[in-house]
């Protein structure tokens, strides 16, 4: 998993509340267990017309936001079913940070397992960031995970809170497998001691 230390990029505004995982990645795209290629299905029902052509009114289809790395979204983002394809689709599109006032718990935790930083802010700060994100190609935000700070295009900054363990994992690019490997030496030492003291179990 790639480390997340500092991210600077275009932020796309999506001022819609209760965006569920079916909206993030419709069920038609859930037939694969591969993490790649799902970006094309991200927000598919909103991004594409019935004939498969792009909907020019959807934010991620607008030229300024096609390469967005940050998503500023309405309250209760990621609600609904627990499909892990939702963060996979965001990541495959290129989005590594989602900012909202709240997230569904399962989606929130799945983000950290896949190298995405979900940030919770107050409604007041979300309104400001949504305004910043509405500047098109000038909607550049910098998310500094080391200092827990978001800097806007005008230089103003917003602090955010994050569980220290989750912060550690993102800063070091550790998913569940990475965490286990990080403890590899301690696991080996335990196995040796356990085998010596309980030879019948070896």
Swiss-Prot record:
GO terms for molecular function: 3-isopropylmalate dehydratase activity. GO terms for biological process: L-leucine biosynthetic process. Pathway: Amino-acid biosynthesis; L-leucine biosynthesis; L-leucine from 3-methyl-2-oxobutanoate: step 2/4. It catalyses: (2R,3S)-3-isopropylmalate = (2S)-2-isopropylmalate. InterPro entries: 3-IsopropMal_deHydase_ssu, Aconitase/3IPM_dehydase_swvl, AconitaseA/IPMdHydase_ssu_swvl, IPMI_Swivel, LeuD. The keyword Amino-acid biosynthesis applies. Its EC number is 4.2.1.33. Keywords: Amino-acid biosynthesis, Branched-chain amino acid biosynthesis, Leucine biosynthesis, Lyase. GO terms for cellular component: 3-isopropylmalate dehydratase complex. PANTHER family: 3-ISOPROPYLMALATE DEHYDRATASE SMALL SUBUNIT, 3-ISOPROPYLMALATE DEHYDRATASE SMALL SUBUNIT 2-RELATED-RELATED. HAMAP family: LeuD_type1. Catalyzes the isomerization between 2-isopropylmalate and 3-isopropylmalate, via the formation of 2-isopropylmaleate. Belongs to the LeuD family. LeuD type 1 subfamily. Heterodimer of LeuC and LeuD. This is 3-isopropylmalate dehydratase small subunit. It comes from Rhizobium etli (strain ATCC 51251 / DSM 11541 / JCM 21823 / NBRC 15573 / CFN 42). The lineage of its organism: Bacteria, Pseudomonadati, Pseudomonadota, Alphaproteobacteria, Hyphomicrobiales.
